[in-house]
Amino acid sequence: MMTNLFSTFDPSTNLFNLSLNWTSTFLGLLLIPSMFWLMPSRINILWNKMNLNLHNEFKTLLGKNSFQGSTLILISIFIMMLFNNFMGLFPYIFTSTSHMTLTFSIALPMWMSFMLFGWINNTNHMFTHLVPQGTPNALMSFMVLIETISNVIRPGTLAVRLAANMIAGHLLLTLLGNTGPSLTTSIMLFLIIGQMLLLILESAVAMIQAYVFSILSTLYSSEVY
């Protein structure tokens, strides 16, 4: 077991000798509204509107050369990250997106698939990305090294960005909550208000980080066409 501060991120806790923490990754599937109702509710209309806006934005970033249905996996990743980030804000629910095990296992295969597709089908186009336009001849070899390194670390930055933001917010909430027993009743009111404001901020961060993860994945995939 980790220290008390990081115990909320401990995936080794179990129930009846079964590690059930990672099952929280799929809790969002239970909350996805049905799309086949005869009369859709307001939530369904809002959900469909959000998906349509994401689809149009991703198609714009991918360009005209993208394949039909290429935005499906990107929207699916956004929805998965969004639900898991929000689920982690509820008490006693394991935050799977705060672990590099999940974020890196999604970012790395996706980045590898983009690279394999680009280098196999558009080799010359991929080589042009290694040397930016207008680079002096003396700096070309150096720019190739820099662009290669920046390309290789992309899956790591995707994974670390999401996990670090989730960990930071939960740690702040934990630290504020641990100070509660030592405070007086009058000061406790300010603590509760502060935690409510921080929870609203964390809700916004949960949505923003899911969007950033999916939009950066879209930008990376648009470079291989």
Swiss-Prot record:
Keyword tags: ATP synthesis, CF(0), Hydrogen ion transport, Ion transport, Membrane, Mitochondrion, Mitochondrion inner membrane, Transmembrane, Transmembrane helix, Transport
Predominant location category: mitochondrion
A Pfam short name: ATP-synt_A
SUPFAM superfamilies attached to this UniProt entry: F1F0 ATP synthase subunit A (SSF81336)
Transmembrane segments: 18-38, 73-93, 100-120, 126-146, 156-176, 187-207
Membrane topology listed for this record: Multi-pass membrane protein
Family: Belongs to the ATPase A chain family.
Functional summary from the UniProt entry: Mitochondrial membrane ATP synthase (F(1)F(0) ATP synthase or Complex V) produces ATP from ADP in the presence of a proton gradient across the membrane which is generated by electron transport complexes of the respiratory chain. F-type ATPases consist of two structural domains, F(1) - containing the extramembraneous catalytic core and F(0) - containing the membrane proton channel, linked together by a central stalk and a peripheral stalk. During catalysis, ATP synthesis in the catalytic domain of F(1) is coupled via a rotary mechanism of the central stalk subunits to proton translocation.
Subunit structure: F-type ATPases have 2 components, CF(1) - the catalytic core - and CF(0) - the membrane proton channel. CF(1) has five subunits: alpha(3), beta(3), gamma(1), delta(1), epsilon(1). CF(0) has three main subunits: a, b and c.
Name of the protein described by the UniProt record: ATP synthase subunit a
